[in-house]
Regions:
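Active-site and donor-binding regions of nucleotide-sugar-utilizing enzymes
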Residues: 15-157, 161
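A conditional alpha-helix N-cap/helix-loop micro-motif detector
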Residues: 83-88, 201-206, 238
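Acidic/glycine-enriched edge-of-secondary-structure segments
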Residues: 8-18, 65-83, 194-200, 224-235
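Generic low-complexity segments that are intrinsically disordered, proline-rich and/or Lys/Arg-biased
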Residues: 7, 13, 97-99, 168
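N-terminal beta-strand-loop-alpha-helix module at the start
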Residues: 2-41, 210-240
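A nucleotide-sugar donor-handling region in carbohydrate enzymes
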Residues: 142-233
Length: 240
């Protein structure tokens, strides 16, 4: 399933992937900050429509140029090679752009199966931590997923998709001050959802937040509370 805005085909293509509410806010703000002039494509999980049936507004409000729903609910947790084949088929049936057409690829929720398509095609990508400080607690993320989806968790850990150490990950985007591990290396990029949201002009901030909430945010403090609320969603179930 897809939703797109009128074509602006002359501009470079940038791809984003997100799964949770926090990650969606994260990639929206990152796009606003670093890729506002490029043509951006967003991949969301098909189950996000349960939480955000208004997902098409991401395009009509010009937050992204194209949005596609990846059919995670239809990919069975079976043998790894079969999962690779299923993911390849899903991507090539749903996304009308060869993966090599993208100048940059950003993945939040990298432990989800879409990342396997990037690995299969040897495509470098940028990794977002799952929520503020979660990079330092990647084993918790693995254990939570393994409790319900052991095959999924095993494959993601094998390819180092919880801790951002896959050789195909060219940078790790995280909130540095929230980490308890060493993130001083060049591959670690500091990004604060809270600060970017606070610093948006009020009109733009409320325009964005109206996608998530029905009422207006009157103060920056309310915006901070919202991001903290999203940060607490880092242990969401796969269906959420």
């Amino acid at each position: 399933m897809k939703y797109t805005s009128p074509s602006i085909s002359d501009k470079p293509l940038v791809l984003y992937h997100a799964v949770s509410s926090y990650q969606l806010l994260e990639v929206i703000l990152h796009r606003m900050t670093y890729h506002s002039r490029e043509r951006t494509v967003l991949i969301l999980p098909d189950f996000i429509t349960q939480k955000y049936p208004q997902y098409k507004k991401l395009v009509t409000r010009r937050l992204f140029n194209e949005v596609y729903l990846f059919p995670y609910l239809h990919i069975l947790h079976r043998e790894e090679q079969q999962i690779f084949e299923d993911v390849k088929l899903c991507y090539e049936q749903i996304i009308p752009h060869p993966i090599t057409d993208f100048s940059e690829i950003y993945v939040a929720g990298a432990h989800f199966y879409f990342s396997l398509y990037l690995i299969q095609n040897r495509m470098p990508f940028h990794f977002f931590e799952d929520a503020a400080g979660m990079l330092s607690r990647s084993n918790e993320l693995y254990e939570t997923l393994a409790a319900s989806f052991p095959t999924h968790a095993r494959i993601a850990r094998k390819h180092r998709l919880f801790n951002g150490e896959s050789p195909y990950i060219c940078s790790v985007i995280c909130l540095k001050k929230a980490q308890t591990i060493d993130v001083s290396g060049e591959r670690y990029v500091d990004f604060s959802v809270e600060e970017v949201l606070q610093n948006l002009p009020e009109r733009k901030r409320n325009h964005l937040i109206h996608f998530f909430l029905k009422h207006r945010l009157w103060t920056k403090a309310e915006a901070i509370l919202l991001t903290q609320h999203f940060a607490n969603l880092n242990m969401m179930s796969e269906e959420e």
